[in-house]
Amino acid sequence: MASKGIDKTIYFVRHGQVSHDVDENGVHREHDPLLNDEGRKQALQLQHDLDAEKLPIELILVSPMRRALETMKIGFQHYIEDKHIPVKVIPLLQDCGDWACNVGSYTKDLEKQFPGYDYTACHEDPVFPKKEKIYKADYKTSIQRSRVLAEFFAKVPEKVFAVVTHGVDIRLFQKIQKPEDSLDAVPKEHSFSPCQHEEFRMHYEDDKNWNFEPVK
């Protein structure tokens, strides 16, 4: 259990655009896709913006989905290479749905494609990349996972850090995702656009009493 009365500054970043191979029912079939050309352009613009903003981050936490890792690698390139900001890959930050595009890759394959980051949490996770238990693709489980993540953020020693993740995950942190909303295709209303980043203040009391407030 994390201590009570904890405040953190978190910069949420949604990954860039991907090209989905969609079947006749609108289901995305491509497994764990990378960014498309437009997504890489968005990530380069993110890099430009982040370099100009000089975020005072001490740590980067990133989803193990390849589109999030690629966004992070491009967007935070100079923070990682010049400022030596550490990167931890956190399976709890994966996307919530269970379409093929939202199912992660094996850790050993991620380490080959995106080397140099801390994959300890992935190696220690007995479930990832399977969509079971805490990663089951339903609303109730996703709410539970957001609570686990809030406690995880509270326990992180760093006070200011970036989180590169997915649109639905951010909606869950904001407590605006509804039971009827899709977990696979992020609703367009009140959602982050590709590579959007925003500063939030997190206040944590316990696993049922926490909130993320945007900094305007």
Swiss-Prot record:
It comes from the Eukaryota. Belongs to the phosphoglycerate mutase family. BPG-dependent PGAM subfamily. It holds the Pfam family His_Phos_1. Its EC number is 3.1.3.-. The lineage of its organism: Eukaryota, Fungi, Dikarya, Ascomycota, Taphrinomycotina. InterPro entries: His_Pase_superF_clade-1 (IPR013078), His_PPase_superfam (IPR029033), PGM_Phosphatase (IPR050275). The record marks H166 as: Transition state stabilizer. It is found in: Cytoplasm; Nucleus. GO terms for molecular function: phosphatase activity. It is an enzyme of class 3 (hydrolase). GO terms for cellular component: cytoplasm; cytosol; nucleus. The active site is at H15 (tele-phosphohistidine intermediate). SUPFAM superfamilies: Phosphoglycerate mutase-like (SSF53254). This is Probable phosphatase SPAC513.02.
